[in-house]
Amino acid sequence: MGKTYIADKETLDKCYAILSADGIYGFIEHMDVLSPTARIEYIGQNKDFTPISLNKDTGTMTLNSWADFPIIVANKPWMVRADGTPDYRLDENDYTKKEDGTASDVSNTSYNGGAFSWLAKIYKQEYMLGNDRVVKFSMRERDGFEPVGFKDPSNNVLEGVWIPMFYGSILGADTSTPKMVSLAGLQPCYNNTTDKEHTAIANFSSRAAFLGGGIVQTITDLLIMFAKSTNSQEAYGYGNSSGYDASLAPTNGVKQNAVVGGGQFYGTKDAKSLNKIFHSIVLGTYQQWMRDPYTLLVNGRYKVSKNYTYDVTGAKYQDTGISLPKMFESDGSAQKYGIFYPHKYQTVPGFGAVPVHPYKGSTSTGGCDGLWQNVEIVAVALRFGACSNGLADGLRSLTVYATAGLASWDFGAAVLLLPPVGVAA
């Protein structure tokens, strides 16, 4: 006889409401299921969708049922002025050209702006249901949904945001006005403190921020949904996650920003190539940790900024009430910093989800990505991983063991550009 599962009426009502809702897309992440594909259950409009599929031999992505999803359709590459207004579209398959075939400014260091792709505003609802995490998306405003990552520091709701197509490079690094840009042909910046990175970002634009915080959470959940999997490397490519080469010091295998063909997505399996997601090599390459000062671990407690307010002490941030325990080396003599592999992620309303203890995953199960932690300092988050971390890298890979003042060859940053209120691409 088959098993019968009985849920309480409140749970069933919530599930039925999700499934019957018009225009709501989403998934349930079953934390107790470790398989990266089996733990994701489609709900709502996409209940019967076929996930995206990557051919890692050719790098080609097939969008399947997601081909007409508004976020994917609207995601185009642009040259964008420093004030956040769009200048002109780039050829989707060759960023060195404008749409009309003439030369672009994608590597022009005199251009007052940079190369960014448009991520249109989407509303999100996220909550825990027992050990499950429910994530729902809507293109229009609804009760209980928030535009997570789409609010500026004044809490204005934006029509979208500009995702950096390239790692942050600092022009005039030795001058009084260093400026971080998103352009091809430049080496990603490294060996800078968080404050130095922040200064360079602010010098680029008053509408510029770090690529971090709630928008990374929203992007990650969209990509989990598209792939129906939490294994981001397997779903989107392995990037340059194993490209470390000590003979190439001081950058040690971190590749120069370059134009990569293949359109919106490009993913390979060699783990030594520039890959891209949403036209961004920052999201797909995993070659350098990206500083996220909007996510802190303050003496073991997560504190977050929901609107790109910058405060590396965390005094101005929301206390999530979620803590990580102190872990010890096997002999109990000292704190163990990692590497850990989370399988459970706890929702922070209006922000996203953070990894929590216990850690029962691996590079191919649970969240599939690594976690490093230090619960005795004020740690500023680093995301995605570096070219020395291999399979521990990924969209959910997280380091919360470094202070704001720590600088390294494998620490960098990228510019998120906020458009003026009411401006859309």
Residue ranges of model-derived segments:
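Short, low-complexity N-terminal tether/leader segments at secretion or assembly junctions of large
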Residues: M1-C15
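Extended N-terminal export/anchoring regions of large proteins
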Residues: L12-D174, F204-G214
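C-terminal, surface-exposed recognition/capping segments
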Residues: Y25-D32, K47, Q217, Y238-V254, ...
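Short aromatic-cysteine micro-motif
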Residues: A103-G113, R140-G284
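Cytochrome P450 core scaffold surrounding the K-helix E-X-X-R motif
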Residues: Y127-L129, L297-K303, A404
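A solvent-exposed, charged loop/short amphipathic helix patch at secondary-structure junctions
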Residues: G168-N192, Y302-M327
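Extracellular/surface-associated beta-sandwich interaction domains
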Residues: T199-A202, S206, P293, V312, ...
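Extracytoplasmic, non-cytosolic globular domains
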Residues: K272-R301, K306
